[in-house]
C-alpha cells in the first residue's frame, strides 16, 4: 500500500483552479482535448498548456505561496520550497509523465518531500500512481508523499476527463547542499534562488 498523507485546503481562499483556467483561457480543465500522441519524458512538459502556465507563473506564484503557507504553517521556515511549481496535464489517451521514476534518480535530494495538488478530479487512470496504487483525490486536496524514494508515475488516461495538477517539493534547510545537477522539467540548477526558494 502506498504511503502518503492527504491534506485539505479551502479553495475559496486559495482558488488555484480558477487562476489556472484564467491564465490558460480554458473554462473546463477536465475537458481539455484528448492527446493524439503519448507523452515521453522529453515531451511531457512541452504542450501549449504548459507554455501558458509557465508564461504566467508570476501571476500564479502569489497564490501558490499562499497555499504553501497554509499547508506548512510554522514549518515553512525550516524548509526551502520549489520556486516554480511543476505543472501537469494528463490528457485523455496520454501519459502525463514519460516513465515511472523516483525523483532521486534524476538528481533530487533523498530528503525532499513531494506535494501533489490536483486542480481537477483525479480518479481511475487519470490520477497519479504511487507504489503501483492509484491515488484518488479531489480539487482542494493535497497528497504529500516521499517522491524522492517512492516509485510514482501515471498510466494511459482512459477516462473521459483530463486531469490537471501541479506539484512542488520541499527540502529541509539542514539538507541543502548546492550542486550543479539540474531539474528535468525545466533545467534549473538545484540551487537557492533558482530551483529552491524561501517562502
Swiss-Prot record:
It comes from the Bacteria. Keywords: Antibiotic biosynthesis, Streptomycin biosynthesis. GO terms for biological process: streptomycin biosynthetic process. This is Streptomycin biosynthesis protein StrG. Pathway: Antibiotic biosynthesis; streptomycin biosynthesis. It comes from Streptomyces griseus. May be involved in the formation of N-methyl-L-glucosamine. The keyword Metal-binding does not apply. Coiled coil: none annotated. Signal peptide: none annotated.
